[in-house]
Amino acid sequence: MQHLLTWHGHANFQIATEGANILIDPFFEGNPSAAAAWQGIAKPDLVLVTHDHGDHVGQTVEICRETGAMMGAIVGTAEKLAAAGVPQQQVLNGIGFNIGGTVLHNGVAVTMTQAYHSSESGAPAGYILTLPDGFTIYHAGDTGIFAGMELWGRLYSIDVALLPIGGVFTMDAKQAALACRLLRARSVVPMHWGTFPVLEGNTARFKEQLMNFAPDCRLFDMKPGETLTLETASEGCACD
């Protein structure tokens, strides 16, 4: 089974798989790295938000209202977004869910993980998505490295990890490379870099550190607007 992973810049990813189209941290307006407007992307049926900072909430309310997509977030942040205009009936699990919990959406199991960051409501989080054929994607959200990544790597067979490398507000390149080893990730897509001058400007240091800490982890060095075709571990991957 094939899955399509599109990076819209920063922490904004879209995953298209059989029966589901999932958008994570839909920061389009005000995102200098976004290659498209939210009105021009494929229609999502689920929007996931890792925490309530503006560069991650983005246009969640507008997208959910326009498309009818469900919205998933931690309890507290889900309440805040419902108050901001996401229709209550579109909130996943009615009130959101919490760290360690799993909800099902159109054949995709969405598991919430912890993240070490800040958030005005709820708590920051990440997501492990187990697609219908078992292919597994981890979106770390904004986080520093934490020892519990090793536990998630033992619990789940992570095919692709989406990890921040920008530093200052999240992990830097060295921490993210070690995170790949803790997670036992088969491949990694670096994110949360290059969007603003304060962040790491490119992936060069991460490439170097990945060779030191997790040389068997395959690097997909995506550019904003690029789509990656993902397949089962026995098959190949290709960038469009």
UniProtKB/Swiss-Prot annotation:
Gene Ontology MF terms in the entry: hydrolase activity
Keywords associated with the record: Hydrolase
Pfam families per UniProt: Lactamase_B_2
Keyword Cell membrane in annotation: no
Membrane spanning stretches: none
SUPFAM superfamilies on file: Metallo-hydrolase/oxidoreductase (SSF56281)
Gene3D superfamilies: Ribonuclease Z/Hydroxyacylglutathione hydrolase-like
PANTHER family linked to this entry: UPF0173 METAL-DEPENDENT HYDROLASE MJ1163 (PTHR43546:SF3), UPF0173 METAL-DEPENDENT HYDROLASE MJ1163-RELATED (PTHR43546)
Family statement drawn from the similarity comment of this UniProt entry: Belongs to the UPF0173 family.
Protein name: UPF0173 metal-dependent hydrolase Dde_0151
Organism per entry: Oleidesulfovibrio alaskensis (strain ATCC BAA-1058 / DSM 17464 / G20)
Taxonomic path: Bacteria, Pseudomonadati, Thermodesulfobacteriota, Desulfovibrionia, Desulfovibrionales
